[in-house]
From Swiss-Prot:
Pfam families: ATP-gua_Ptrans. InterPro entries: Arg_Kinase, ATP-guanido_PTrfase, ATP-guanido_PTrfase_AS, ATP-guanido_PTrfase_cat, Gln_synth/guanido_kin_cat_dom. The gene is mcsB. Keywords: Allosteric enzyme, ATP-binding, Kinase, Nucleotide-binding, Transferase. One of its GO terms (cellular component) is extracellular space. It comes from Syntrophomonas wolfei subsp. wolfei (strain DSM 2245B / Goettingen). This is Protein-arginine kinase. It catalyses: L-arginyl-[protein] + ATP = N(omega)-phospho-L-arginyl-[protein] + ADP + H(+).
């Protein structure tokens, strides 16, 4: 996949849920490593001169590296990127909303065209190295992110303190600089009214539950990001092991509640899922929030064998494909709200039809 296809097409490596572990509940795993250069001011303090110097150092490190996966990545500079394309990168989860909206000097993205590896340049930190994989694969995501980290550190001098670890713009990231997160689909926990209690317990265990695009975003379509809070005093391996163990408990609770809903609310659940499928396959206008809510019900119905089998890849693609920037990119022109809702309904009808296995 070329970098042009990254913007023109939706499917990315993390969307491949066909064979990934626990992929009916764990949509994706992400590991992010925050790094800063030792002799360059933090991003919010950069001026034009230091920003230019910083970008030159990053460019040279990328060009000099002989590590295969780093050489396969391509550099996208934001000064040459439209606001629409920045939003597309946010909708693909490759950059944060803050990164897209920032006006700081010299920002960009090093990205592997399949989206499995990405390095945000000059977001909150100089570098945020990320690996995205489908299903529950935190160890593998960390391994691949660490390889990029090691390759860059051969060429760059990272800010590191022997006592505190890696130094970051935000004190909560000091230490490993690592944020491990899972994108979870938890409809049964939400429907049963257990989310408040469960999420409070997760917070007490040192984990954070956020919305679909991370910090400061709302949970839509029963998608939640579960991530570690603590980066100091724990090793990367310990952080991953803890998050994996606790997430397994959340997964088990979700499975038990799905079974309970089926046993105790069979007809109500069938009606809810059937109505969602009917609306999505026939609607001519649909908003983003309504679509994500109904797609959550359809995904639940597929996972529980209550409606025709639809490829998990098709459902994962739809979550991104129906977002405003992707719809506008497909249309090739500006769209008002009604036009977007009409295009969204069309995209969903087509995808659900073509995504049905055996059709």
């Amino acid at each position: 996949m070329s970098i042009k296809k990254l913007f023109a097409e939706t499917f990315l490596a993390w969307m491949n849920g066909e064979t990934a572990s626990q992929s009916d509940i764990v949509i994706s795993s992400r590991v992010r490593l925050a790094r800063n250069l030792s002799d360059i001011a933090f991003p919010h303090l950069l001026n034009q001169e230091s920003g230019q110097k910083f970008m030159q150092l990053i460019y040279e490190a990328w060009q000099k590296s002989e590590f295969k996966e780093l050489k396969q990545m391509e550099l996208v500079t934001f000064e040459n990127l439209s606001a629409l394309d920045r939003k597309i990168l946010v909708e693909k989860h490759l950059i944060s909303p803050n990164h897209a909206q920032s006006t700081a000097f010299y920002q960009g993205l090093l990205v592997k065209p399949d989206g499995s590896l990405a390095v945000m340049i000059n977001e909150e930190d100089h570098l945020r190295i990320q690996c995205f994989l489908p299903g529950l694969q935190l160890e593998e995501a960390y391994r691949r992110a660490q390889e990029i980290d090691d390759a860059l550190e051969k060429e760059l001098d990272f800010a590191f303190d022997d006592r505190r670890g890696y130094l970051t713009s935000c004190p909560t990231n000091i230490g490993t600089g690592m944020r491990a997160s899972l994108m979870l689909h938890l409809p049964a926990i939400t429907i049963s009214g257990q989310s408040g209690h469960i999420f409070q317990n997760l917070n007490q265990l040192g984990l954070t539950v956020r919305g679909i695009y991370g910090e400061g975003t709302e949970a839509i379509g029963n998608f939640f990001q579960l991530s570690n809070q603590i980066t100091l005093g724990q090793s990367e391996e310990d952080i991953n092991a803890s998050l994996t163990t606790i997430s397994q408990q959340v997964i088990e609770q979700e499975r038990m509640l799905r079974k309970s809903l089926r046993e105790q609310m069979k007809y109500q659940l069938e009606d809810r899922i059937g109505r969602a499928y009917g609306i999505l396959t026939h609607a001519r206008l649909i908003s983003s929030n309504e679509a994500l809510t109904l797609l959550s019900d359809v995904r639940l119905g597929v996972d529980m064998g209550m409606i025709p089998r639809i490829s998990p890849n098709a459902l994962n693609e739809l979550v991104v494909d129906i977002r405003p920037a992707h719809l506008q990119k497909k249309a090739g022109s500006d769209m008002d709200a009604v036009s977007r809702d009409a295009k969204r309904a069309e995209v969903i009808r087509e995808k659900l039809q073509t995504g049905e296995e055996g059709s």
